[in-house]
Amino acid sequence: MNIFRLLLATLLVSLCFLTAYSHLAEEKPKDDRSLRSNSSVNLLDFPSVSIVALNKKSKKISRKEAEKKRSSKKKASMKNVARPRPPPPTPCVATRNSCKSPAPACCDPCASCQCRFFRSACTCRVLSPRC
């Protein structure tokens, strides 16, 4: 019985090695001419790169420019936030209240009516707080 188990174990191991070997990718050796002609990347196509050392003044100027850009972005975002919102319609539904199809629109301009469970439970929800 032990010889039979040993034979089965060696058969199993050999099958494992055969399956692993069959899944390995085969690489065919290519000559240098075919590699040169088939290569899609040509080193002459790329421009040369020059490395320039920065002095302290240029570093300070670039920091100042970066701060100016940051401040201008903050000012622009402040302008976008300050825009007036349209007034809500007179008969409107508050946020998180029921808004079935015969009900009027939501009061918040950023909110929309979302329905669940085959339109049996509908509520006004704000989708994006940055509206």
Swiss-Prot record:
Q: What is the first-listed, main subcellular location in coarse terms?
A: secreted
Q: Which GO terms describe its biological process?
A: hormone-mediated signaling pathway; melanin biosynthetic process; melanosome organization
Where is it located?
Answer: Secreted
Indicate the secretion signal residues.
1-22
Keywords associated with the record = Disulfide bond, Glycoprotein, Knottin, Secreted, Signal
Residues annotated as glycosylated are N38
**What are the boundaries of the region Disordered?**
57-93
Any one Pfam family match given in the protein's UniProt record, by short name: Agouti
What does the annotation give as the result of altering R96C? In strain: Black German Shepherd
Q: What is known of its domains?
A: The presence of a 'disulfide through disulfide knot' structurally defines this protein as a knottin.
What does the protein in this record do? Involved in the regulation of melanogenesis. The binding of ASP to MC1R precludes alpha-MSH initiated signaling and thus blocks production of cAMP, leading to a down-regulation of eumelanogenesis (brown/black pigment) and thus increasing synthesis of pheomelanin (yellow/red pigment).
* Name listed for the protein in its UniProt record: Agouti-signaling protein
The scientific name of the source species is Canis lupus familiaris (Dog)
